[in-house]
From Swiss-Prot:
Single strand-specific metallo-endoribonuclease involved in late-stage 70S ribosome quality control and in maturation of the 3' terminus of the 16S rRNA. One of its GO terms (biological process) is rRNA processing. It is found in: Cytoplasm. This is Endoribonuclease YbeY. Zn(2+) binds at H114, H118, H124. One of its GO terms (molecular function) is RNA endonuclease activity. Its EC number is 3.1.-.-. Its main location: cytoplasm. The gene is ybeY. It comes from Salmonella dublin (strain CT_02021853). Belongs to the endoribonuclease YbeY family.
Length: 157
């Protein structure tokens, strides 16, 4: 049986309306056990200022972003279940959900799935990687009872 341990950190000023710890746990449980038996993940919910600072420092992008993934890399010869950290910006997630006419809960779930796949080594730098990652995201979201997060883009094509 797989086990995903969640460390949820609420670093944003307003906690009202945020998904609860059980929801974040369910979303992690929907993705990570498909790839590894044990994992520890920190999810830190932040405001735009912290997201902006981290995005600028680590990605060179001068704006806040929806989710940042920081995979843990253990020193050689040491095995630990620590998968890494997800930094999710509340305001960006809420704004994107509204702009994209997506249910807010579904967009939160998508950000956890998307970020978790980054922690597991997936990326979307080139078209083939993006297609593989988006396909996995869609499969996982559908399995958890949500719509395809890319349906609007697919319809537009």
């Amino acid at each position: 049986m797989s086990q995903v341990i969640l460390d949820l950190q609420l670093a944003c000023e307003n906690h009202a309306g945020l998904p609860d710890e059980a929801q974040f746990q369910r979303w992690l449980d929907g993705v990570i056990p498909q790839f590894q038996e044990e994992a520890e993940v920190t999810i830190r919910l932040v405001d735009e200022t912290e997201s902006h600072d981290l995005n600028l420092t680590y990605r060179g992008k001068d704006k806040p972003t929806n989710v940042l993934s920081f995979p843990f890399e253990a020193p050689p010869g040491i095995e630990m279940p620590l998968l890494g950290d997800l930094i999710i910006c509340r305001q960006v997630v809420e704004q994107e959900a509204q702009e994209q006419s997506k249910p807010l809960e579904a967009h939160w779930a998508h950000m956890v799935v998307h970020g978790s796949l980054h922690l597991l080594g997936y990326d979307h730098i080139d078209d083939d990687e993006a297609e593989e990652m988006e396909s996995l995201e869609t499969e996982i979201m559908l399995a958890m009872g949500y719509e395809d997060p890319y349906i609007a883009e697919k319809i537009a094509e």
